[in-house]
Regions:
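A generic transmembrane alpha-helix motif of multi-pass inner-membrane proteins
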Residues: 379-402, 424-457
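Membrane-embedded translocation segments of transport machinery
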Residues: 2-7, 11, 169, 173-321, ...
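Extracellular loop-to-transmembrane helix junctions
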Residues: 38-64, 144, 390-391
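Select transmembrane alpha-helical segments in multipass membrane proteins
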Residues: 10-21, 45-49, 87-101, 147-152, ...
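Membrane-interface "cap" regions at the ends of multi-pass membrane proteins
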Residues: 1-32, 61-66, 70-83, 87-91, ...
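Helix-loop-helix connectors at the membrane interface of multi-pass transporters/channels
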Residues: 2-4, 78, 111-140, 241-244, ...
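Transmembrane helix-boundary motif of multi-pass solute transporters/channels
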Residues: 13-53, 249-252, 256-259, 290
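Inter-helical loop and helix-membrane interface segments of multi-pass membrane transporters/permeases
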Residues: 5-8, 37-41, 76-95, 108-165, ...
Length: 457
């Protein structure tokens, strides 16, 4: 196998990879999805299970995908195709490549919602945002949601057009420190509110009584969102990593960074909701509506609701942008590698796909609300298809490629380049060979069963 021979865009070094990969991971999955899942599935017990999975399942998949990208110097399709021409290898590569192309359009729609809320907080409309029906009225307004979506999407495309170092890496290095600073500020403010201590205890202290099998399944599913697993991103970013950069050290830094932000997101939101609702179970289990409906009501009840609202949605916007940039970069890289297009042409085509598919999701709660796929609006369907079906399949394909085709020894050799260490090698080998495929299959089956009403999650 030939490796590392053709010229390819690269990150400037370890910091560039870590911040870009962390930026990909620290997105809406951390700031939006993680807190509402933690609130719904038992607080501290969910957090404990999540951390255990992050150190095993999540870590192993991050290392596997990054190593696969660097050893092949290819985006997902090329990386899988490097080891044979069989149909299942081609399928594994393409499903990894298609996922970000389908995710980033609807992700940009949600990013547009964040822009709308940020603008309204800047205008001082804190009380309006907290009124019942505000969010549903906004997303059903086709013109308003379209404008916000286009602003977010075009900004993302513009950054990708600038390149890996001048676009992706530079923006990540700028935004990630801001994200960390704002996370710390808002976390401190939230946990010091009157009545917030009970929320802190609920989130940080595991209570075995809150344990259920669905807690484990939800935590496993969150791994994909939080760590950008099975989206083609880490394979692509791995292909930009220099050989003198340690994969184990870099991915460990990403893992720690991502988990720390997720924990801070929980401390930002759950104690504040506790203080606002007195720990009301219905409020805690608001689900996806937590950020756009419940949190504005929480902020409206605070003395510093407007400035905190501004800071919070700046934080969410930074997180959303870094992830959308990573998703788009992965898609663009596939077009460059497989169609031999230049970066500019690839970016423009991906941008056009984003706008076409994104408009369906943007209008799905308004003018196109009557159009549903298996009972779901466009945004919900794309989310279900990618996260509940395609990503677990992509993860299984990656595990089989590494354990059955490439061989664990070759991946180990790639990982030790740079610093020459692989401290968690035994965990990696066991997880990739046995548990990761099983976990992914459980997520796939339980998610599909939940979507069709066979079980309730």
């Amino acid at each position: 196998m030939e490796t590392h021979k053709h010229e390819r865009s690269t990150f400037s070094g370890k910091l560039g990879f870590v911040l870009s990969a962390a930026g990909a991971s620290v997105g809406l999955g951390n700031i939006w999805r993680f807190p509402y899942l933690a609130a719904k599935y038992g607080g501290g017990i969910f957090l404990l299970i999540y951390i255990i999975l992050a150190l095993t399942f999540g870590y192993s998949m991050i290392v596997a995908e990054t190593a696969l990208g660097r050893m092949t110097q290819k985006s997902p399709v090329g990386a899988f195709g490097k080891f044979g021409k069989s149909k299942w290898l081609s399928f594994g590569g393409w499903i990894n490549a298609i996922i970000p192309i389908l995710i980033v359009p609807y992700y940009s729609v949600i990013g547009g919602w964040v822009i709308k809320y940020l603008v309204e907080y800047v205008k001082g409309n804190t009380q309006n945002l907290a009124t019942d029906g505000y969010f549903s009225e906004f997303i059903s307004n086709g013109v308003s949601t379209e404008i916000c979506f286009l602003v977010f999407a075009l900004f993302t495309v513009g950054i990708i057009y600038a390149g890996v170092r001048n676009g992706v890496e530079r923006v990540s290095k700028f935004m990630m420190p801001i994200l960390v600073f704002l996370s710390i500020v808002i976390t401190i403010y939230s946990v010091t509110r009157p009545g917030a201590l009970e929320g802190v205890k609920y989130f940080l202290i595991p209570n075995p009584k809150n344990f259920s099998w669905m807690t484990v399944v939800a935590a496993m599913g969150q791994m994909f969102y939080s760590l950008s697993i099975a989206m083609g991103i880490l394979v692509t970013f791995g292909s930009y990593m220099k050989t003198d950069v340690s994969i184990e050290s870099s991915t460990t830094n990403v893992e720690i960074f991502d988990t720390a932000i997720a924990i801070m997101a929980g401390l930002m939101i759950i104690p504040a909701v506790f203080a606002f609702s007195g720990g009301d179970p219905d409020t805690l289990q608001a689900g996806p509506a937590l950020m756009f409906i419940t949190i504005p009501k929480v902020f409206a009840s605070m003395g510093l609701g407007t400035p905190i609202g501004i800071l919070f949605f700046v934080l969410v916007l930074c997180a959303a942008l870094t992830s959308s940039i990573a998703l788009t970069e992965s898609a663009v890289s596939t077009f460059q590698d497989e169609l031999k297009w230049c970066r500019q042409k690839s970016t423009l085509v991906v941008g056009a796909i984003m706008i076409v598919l994104g408009r369906l999701s943007s209008l799905g709660y308004g003018p196109l609300a009557c159009v549903k796929i298996i009972g779901m609006q466009f945004l919900d369907f794309f989310d279900f298809l990618t996260n509940s079906v395609m990503m677990p399949i992509a993860a299984i394909a990656t595990c089989l490629l590494i354990s059955r085709v490439i061989g664990l020894k070759k991946v180990e050799d790639e990982v030790v380049l740079g610093e020459g260490t692989f401290k968690r090698k035994k965990i990696f080998n066991f997880m990739i060979k046995y548990l990761c495929p099983i976990f992914a299959a459980i997520i796939l089956l339980s998610s599909v069963a939940n979507a069709f009403g066979w079980i309730s999650m």
